[in-house]
Design a protein with these regions (language model features):
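C-terminal helical "lid" of AAA+/P-loop NTPase domains
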Residues: 245-250, 256-270, 308-314, 344
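Conserved C-terminal helix/linker of AAA+ ATPases
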Residues: 244, 267-290
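Conserved Walker B catalytic segment
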Residues: 124-192, 201
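C-terminal leucine-rich, beta-strand-based interaction scaffolds used for sensing/assembly
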Residues: 2-4, 293-372
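A short, basic N-terminal segment
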Residues: 1-36, 41, 59, 111, ...
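P-loop NTPase nucleotide-binding core
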Residues: 39-44, 48-153, 337
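Short, Lys/Arg-enriched N-terminal segment that forms or immediately precedes the first helix
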Residues: 7-11, 285-300
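Helix-loop-helix "sensor" segment of P-loop NTPases
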Residues: 198-249, 271-273
Length: 372
C-alpha cells in the first residue's frame, strides 16, 4: 500500500499539505521577473515548497529551473562546484543545443566533459580540484544562464552559508553577477533568519532590497490535523486528533519530523484500524533511540564549554540572555566570555539557531535527546 506521508523525493500535489497561498505568491513573483527570499526554521518544509513550485506546470513548461543546496559548502570554490554541476545536470541535459552552449561556455572546466557510449548520454566529471579559478568559473556559469534559450529560475537553499566563507567579498561578487544576468531570477532561502535578514535588509549590504522577503511559518495545527486525518481516511484507516496533536507539539510544528512520525504511524495502522497517542509516543521514543549514535558522535566533537551550553539551551527550550549572570548561574556555566565563544561555534556548526535574541536547538529531535 502506498504511504501518503512522503518524507523524501517528489510529493504529489494531493499529498502536499497546505501552503497554497505561499506557493501562489512564490510562483507569481518568480514568473514575473522578481527575486524572492524565503526564510524559515529548518525542516518546516521550505525546500519541499520550492520543489513544489518549480514542478508547477507554468514553470516546468516555460522556464529552466536549477536548484542547489549550499549548506555543506565552505568556500567560493565549493559554491562554483555545486552551481556548475547543477547547471549541467539540471539544465544542459534538456537539449543538444543547451549542451553545446554549456560545453563551449564553461571553458575553464572544459576537460571535465565527456560521453558515455553505453548510456548514450553526455557526462560531466567535475571534482572540486578542477576549479582553479572560481571567479572565472562563476563568470562562465552566469554566461550560460544568460545564453539559455529559456529564462532560468535558480533556487539557492541555505543562502546564508556564503556569510561563513573565508572570501569576505562573496556577497558583492554574487550580487554583481546576478545584477548583470537578465535571463534569470533567483529564489534565495535560508534557515538562519538573523543572517538572512541582515543580508537583505541592511543598507550597507550588497543584497539590500534586491528581493521580496517571505517568512514561512509552521503549518497551523488545525490544517495539519485535517490533512493527516483525510489521508488516513482515504486509505480506510483512522487516527485520533489527540495523536496528531502529540506529534505536532512534541516537534513544535516541524513538518519533517511530524511527517516522519505520521509515515510510521500509517505503516503500523491496519485497514479499519486507529492510530492513537500511545502509538505516536512509542514512535517518537524509537526515533530518539535510532539517532542516539549520531547525536553522541556530534557531541564527541565538541569542547566541554560547548557541550555545557548546548545542554543548557536544550533544557531552557528557548534560551534568552545566555551571557547573563542569572543564566550562567542557573545552568552552572563558566563565564560570559566562555558562553560567547561557545555560542559562536554552536551557531557555526548549525547545532543552535537564533531569532530575536533567543537561542534554541536547531534539530528538535536532538533537543529531545539532550533532555533525556
Amino acid at each position: 500500500m502506498e504511504n501518503p506521508f512522503i518524507i523524501t523525493g517528489y510529493i504529489k500535489p494531493e499529498y502536499f499539505c497546505d501552503r497554497k497561498q505561499e506557493a501562489k505568491r512564490i510562483i507569481t513573483k518568480i514568473t514575473n521577473g522578481e527575486n524572492i527570499v524565503i526564510m524559515a526554521a529548518r525542516r518546516v518544509g521550505k525546500s519541499k515548497l520550492i520543489d513544489f513550485c518549480l514542478d508547477s506546470p507554468i514553470i516546468k513548461d516555460n522556464f529552466i529551473s536549477i536548484s542547489i543546496d549550499i549548506l555543506r559548502t565552505s568556500s567560493i570554490n565549493e559554491f562554483a562546484f555545486e552551481l556548475g554541476k547543477a547547471v549541467f545536470e539540471q539544465a544542459a541535459r534538456r537539449s543538444t543545443k543547451l549542451l553545446k552552449m554549456v560545453v563551449n561556455t564553461l571553458k575553464s572546466i572544459n576537460g571535465c566533459f565527456g560521453y558515455d557510449p553505453i548510456s548514450n548520454t553526455p557526462t560531466f566529471n567535475l571534482s572540486l580540484g578542477d576549479i582553479s579559478n572560481p571567479l572565472y568559473t562563476l563568470e562562465e556559469i552566469f554566461a550560460c544562464l544568460e545564453q539559455a534559450d529559456k529564462k532560468c529560475i535558480v533556487a539557492i537553499d541555505e543562502f546564508q552559508q556564503i556569510g561563513y566563507y573565508p572570501e569576505k567579498n562573496m556577497e558583492a561578487v554574487l550580487r554583481t553577477y546576478i545584477q548583470r544576468c537578465s535571463n534569470a531570477n533567483f529564489i534565495f532561502s535560508g534557515s538562519e533568519r538573523h543572517l538572512i535578514t541582515e543580508m537583505f535588509s541592511e543598507k550597507a549590504r550588497p543584497f539590500y532590497n534586491s528581493a521580496d522577503i517571505m517568512n514561512l511559518d509552521v503549518i497551523p495545527i488545525d490544517r495539519y490535523t485535517e490533512f493527516a486525518i483525510g489521508l488516513f481516511h482515504h486509505f480506510d484507516k483512522d487516527i485520533q486528533a489527540e495523536a496528531i496533536a502529540l506529534a505536532y507539539h512534541t516537534f513544535g510544528g516541524n513538518t519533517y519530523y511530524i511527517q516522519k512520525v505520521m509515515h510510521e504511524a500509517f505503516n503500523q495502522t491496519d485497514p479499519k484500524g486507529v492510530a492513537d497517542s500511545e502509538m505516536i509516543d512509542a514512535i517518537i521514543r524509537s526515533l530518539i533511540l535510532d539517532n542516539d549514535r549520531k547525536f553522541s558522535e556530534i557531541l564527541s566533537r565538541l569542547t566541554l564549554p560547548q557541550k555545557e551550553l548546548l545542554y543548557a539551551i536544550a533544557k531552557a527550550g528557548m534560551a534568552k540572555k545566555i551571557t547573563s549572570a542569572a543564566f550562567i548561574k542557573k545552568h552552572n556555566l563558566r563565564s560570559g566570555s566562555s558562553v560567547q565563544s561557545a555560542i559562536k561555534k554552536l551557531l557555526e556548526y548549525h547545532l543552535v539557531s537564533t531569532s530575536q535574541a533567543t537561542y534554541y536547538i536547531d534539530d528538535q529531535l536532538m533537543g529531545l535527546w539532550l533532555k533525556m
